[in-house]
A protein has these predicted regions:
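Hydrophobic, lipid-facing positions within transmembrane beta-strands of outer-membrane proteins
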Residues: 96-102, 109, 180-185
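Repeated loop/turn-to-beta-strand initiation elements of outer-membrane beta-barrel proteins
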Residues: 108-113, 192-193
């Protein structure tokens, strides 16, 4: 008991999920993002508090960061960020899975609609974790990236440094959804009409999903 099993490797030694006793199977495991560094003064303030907390004058809160980089939560309270600050970021298992069927009829017409959905789970958007490089196409989300002129965003600056591309809550999204599964619209011709052509019953319908 108590052994942790990492899984969900996305490359570069990064595991997305963790399994351990007393927790949901393969819950998402990473850093919790609490903001974006806005300027050097803010970074200096975090570093000074880290130094005071540890008694090490050279201690940084996070290594290799600049304005526009993600700020991670100091979960274990030691004053600076290490791998020990990773935490449970949510489960991929839905809390509820269900469906809903609705049907109605009127003067020979009938309509059936089925919905399907699940709720309460998380998904990990690995596509967003890919590090930006000059040889790749830019994802559209980078249009809203942090710049001094665009500080009110949660998309970090564009950089080759790996700090922003750690497994973190930034890439964990809601997996809840409701979708229209099937629709069927039909019409049953009156029996008085069908008797004239020696047909007992006739129904035409259109369906889609």
């Amino acid at each position: 008991g108590g052994k942790r099993i990492a899984s969900g490797d996305i490359g570069a030694g990064k595991s997305v999920q963790m399994t351990e006793e007393g927790k949901p199977i393969k819950y998402f495991y990473g850093y919790n993002v609490i903001g974006i560094f806005q300027n050097e003064a803010q970074i200096k303030d975090y570093n000074e508090r880290a130094a005071a907390s540890t008694g090490n004058a050279g201690q940084q809160y996070q290594n290799n960061v600049g304005p526009g980089d993600l700020i991670y939560e100091d979960v274990d309270g030691d004053g600076y960020i290490t791998a020990n600050d990773r935490k449970d970021l949510g489960s991929p298992t839905p809390k509820f899975i269900g469906g809903l069927g609705i049907s109605a009829s009127w003067k020979g017409f009938d309509l059936s609609i089925d919905f399907q959905g699940n709720f309460g789970n998380k998904i990990f958007n690995a596509k967003q974790v890919e590090r930006f490089s000059g040889s790749d196409n830019w994802d559209r989300s980078f249009l809203d990236r942090w710049t001094p002129e665009n500080p009110n965003t949660m998309t970090p600056r564009m950089t080759l440094e790996g700090n922003n591309y750690q497994v973190s809550s930034r890439y964990v999204e809601s997996g809840s959804y409701v979708k229209l599964q099937t629709v069927e619209l039909g019409y049953t011709f009156p029996k008085s009409w069908m008797q004239k052509v020696s047909v007992q019953n006739l129904r035409v319908f259109f369906s889609g999903n």
